Amino acid sequence: YNFLRRHEKMDKFVLNLIHRPEMVPEYSATVTGQGKEEDIGDKALLTESLDIFKTQQRLAHENGLKVTIQMTYASLFNDEAVEIAKHDHEVYGDEIALSLLGLPCEEFREKYKTKDFCIWMFSMEDKKAIVNDVFEKFHDKFGFYPESTGSYYMDADLTNYTKEKYPPVKCAVAT
């Protein structure tokens, strides 16, 4: 039986290709550490980040692949990133998801009065407020709640809260 199962043809291969429009990439913090002044609103950085996202999307679609677009908090404030996601959702059937990464943007810093940006570093009370803020901003932009979300790390309390508060979420990706 095992021999037969190992040699059967696989009918379906599932690939979940995830792109995040990173308006303020976390790697940009390393540039600051090399003596450059921090500017999370740097237009050149925003343009470069958006160009990378557009290229990823174009290449995926040219090769017939659908994509899960994980919108970051920062990208929800970028009209072009939102329009690309809406377009690719309608035209190619890409999923529009929500990442709890990409928090370090001017809007986040002003609202939460911190430069911290890792969701797992906040108190549970603050995590809930951030999740509510991010999910409601997503809903305002797209008219629905995402079916998937993710972060580098999501503890059980945060995962359970997200699922309870936002039942459309069926998947959480934590790397």
Language-model features: locations:
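Catalytic alpha-helical scaffold of carbohydrate-active enzymes acting on polysaccharides/glycoconjugates
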Residues: Y1-S148, Y153-T175
